[in-house]
Amino acid sequence: MEWQPLDFERPIFDLERRLEDLKNHSDKHDVDLDPAMKDLEAKLRETRRRIYGNLTAWQRVQIARHTQRPFALDYIDRCFANWVELHGDRRFADDKAMPCGLATFGGQRCVVITHQKGRNTKENVMRNFGCAHPEGYRKALRLMRLGEKFGMPVISLIDTPGAFPGIGSEERHISEAIAVNLREMMTLRVPIVAAVIGEGGSGGALGIGVADRVLILENAYYSVISPEACSAILWRDRRHAAEAAEALKLTAQDLFKLEIVDEIVAEPEGGAHRDYDSTAANLSKALRGALQQVCQLPVAELLEKRYQKFRRLGVFSEGKTVSASAQA
């Protein structure tokens, strides 16, 4: 699969193409172009270091949305064994935006709940662009309760722009479905580990994100609102999305500082889409470590720590009181 660069990656892409052309020319015509190629390789390394070492929040959002980025099922193929997908919420339908099922991870049987996007128009229509309906969240809850019944930990892979806001979704009470998941996950009597692997959009992400450990990939984001929507509300113009992204503190690095997430999972240089296997290996290692930490806890302690974890979220500051005379 040929790499499709983002706008800010164009200088890297152009250098890589030039380097490839030189190598092909050297091989084809048996010409020694090693000095030129070494110079170009040095320039490429420096360009990569400069661009990827200084990514803005908005650039990380673009990487998180990259159409070639590995999705949940790509990680399931690489990190899990004996995957069996289960379907339906037993009320209305099966939501293909949220594949959920049973799998083996690190020799242990577990429940896996996910969001899934598509790579082309046909797949995106089937997956609803990763935007789940109420039946998706109810299916996820059905499987989590199954995991609780049989003592299986829950692993959640989050990658959604947000829950689907269509008329049918509202008629079937999407807000209620998410709210019930928040309540039930808080008291689920088995360990829960969540990982934001791409987009973590608002309540749609949080609906399967109440966990004992929350991981996030290096270039993923987790936010109450998309930068474009925030820009449209605050500036009445979507063109301020980059400024909104900075203000929202939605990057993995900001979220870790704010203690919203517990661990940042490293990605290869350029993003997860540049190397699926190494990203999957990093995620698998992080998930295994997180599960080891929480699986050894007694149930009562597990639930108390989960409750306190979410009670501690958020910071506030107080402004100085200004008297009426001072205002005058």
Question: What are the functions of these language-model segments?
Answer:
Residues 61-64, 125-129, 270-273:
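Short hinge/gating elements
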Residues 53, 92-94, 100, 105-157, ...:
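Glycine-rich beta-alpha loop segments
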Residues 1-109, 277-328:
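Intrinsically disordered, low-complexity segments enriched in small/flexible residues
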Residues 15, 56, 112, 159, ...:
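Terminal peptide-recognition signature
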Residues 33-36, 136-137, 230:
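Short, motif-level signal for alpha-helix interfacial/capping segments enriched in acidic residues
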Residues 158-288, 292, 296:
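Conserved catalytic cores of soluble enzyme domains
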Residues 70-72, 120-122, 164-166:
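Short active-site-adjacent helix-start/loop capping segments
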